[in-house]
């Protein structure tokens, strides 16, 4: 669609805005313009709380909401029980890798979600009493829900990505989730980051307006943020919460030279992955393997990305 094209332009110009020392005002202006055009032309609107938390269609069905600008439909003849997106990220399904990996949110990020922000409901609270007090909507029937909470659920477990139709036991029904490639919400964040480069006050207004759709009691307010650096940090926190598990933040963190913080007091990361990186992580630069550049005269080891092996130190 034209809106998806505008969205791709917005993504590209936002990246290009940082290519020049001190920023490229023209690229940032175009990023904001294309992001706004994508919003307008698409006619799309941010997800509501009901759509976000729906145990049958949450983040698995493009036709169930008015948020997705671009996505891929998936049918059950294209997937197996474990080789698909749902099997890796939908914790309520009983057939996938999630029964072992139990993906969840970083505790430090969870603690930054405002109390009135309904995105809290994508992740199980460390207070287990909230699991059964009506705070959450779970997929499956009562028996399936009880089994999930008893054996698979842990504090901070993600329930953002639901098995299709809320089916937790039959993978041919629960696995074929539509693949989301671009939500209109991303355009709002691109616009505010680009606008912030020249008009911080307007960018704060844009973030406040967006967050009023997430913190429904109206209590969110970033007006006190004093400079561009602090605004970008706050904006990234909200963007991380918004797009957790969707693959959007990878490029933001590379572009803005942000690091990884997993080793800290009270961290919920497994020890083998609990490392900290100041600035972009070396593992984010993909390395072409030796067999490929030995067989392909068009590339060489000299032009390859550096091998990141051994550059990440895991604390004892």
Tell what function each PLM region has.
Residues 1-86, 99, 103, 110-316:
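Acidic/polar-rich alpha-helix caps and helix-coil junctions
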Residues 89-90:
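A low-complexity, Ser/Thr/Gly/Pro-enriched, surface-exposed linker/loop concept
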